[in-house]
């Protein structure tokens, strides 16, 4: 008898009206689309190793020094050695965005509403993710890429060498001195013109401005967009991004706010937006993401010209 009432609640929520589903998970198809846009728009996600998270914490087993091999004769006993491991733990933090909309949106379906808001939600997410993970801006995480590079003095000031390509080569050498290869760069959009002008001894461009992937020194380079990059702190970051871990928990939750005052949104009179006064509602969308750079020496930063390294 119970089988008659075996209703798919997620399907019901997806196809229902927003006014009847004031809290819940973003419909599956729209949530997948938002995450696809986030992955496409976030430089840190495109470069890093992304791990799924089934809970808010995930522990990793990382071998920092492997066991040694020994030459032995036919009658000699093989020596033993001990591998060294670390067990870093990544913790997912909640990331949220609040988007004001007219009350009429409550009469639309959840599928249509989140299909329409998909670009705005995704952009807010990937901008915040890049700013936090790269620079520690408004970040809940204990480390950022910039902080680990700065902590071991893996930094060079732009203009130290005769040209940008030589500065970047020296930057790569800092990582290579630690026995690691650079496998990618990230930088701000304003550096593109300087990169396009770089040539090798045969006149060939060092920067390849491909359609699907851009490369510098035969490694992918990602340009951080929409204000996430802090040009006062860095021109470019080099790294072995296998040592940058990002964890993502499945699902994007939402909540409809009706009476809130949004202090991050100001009206023409300079006052914060009061939803009830403006006959509006707001949609709060949240996701959970973790971040952990697991090897400090895997990253190096090119500081802007004039930057004083302390």
Residue ranges and their predicted role:
Residues 86-89, 97-177, 301-302, 308-310:
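Alpha-helical scaffold segments that mediate packing/assembly in large oligomeric complexes
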Residues 16-97, 298:
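Assembly/oligomerization interface modules of large self-assembling protein complexes
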Residues 29, 39, 55, 112, ...:
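Generic recognition of stable, solvent-exposed alpha-helical segments in well-folded globular domains
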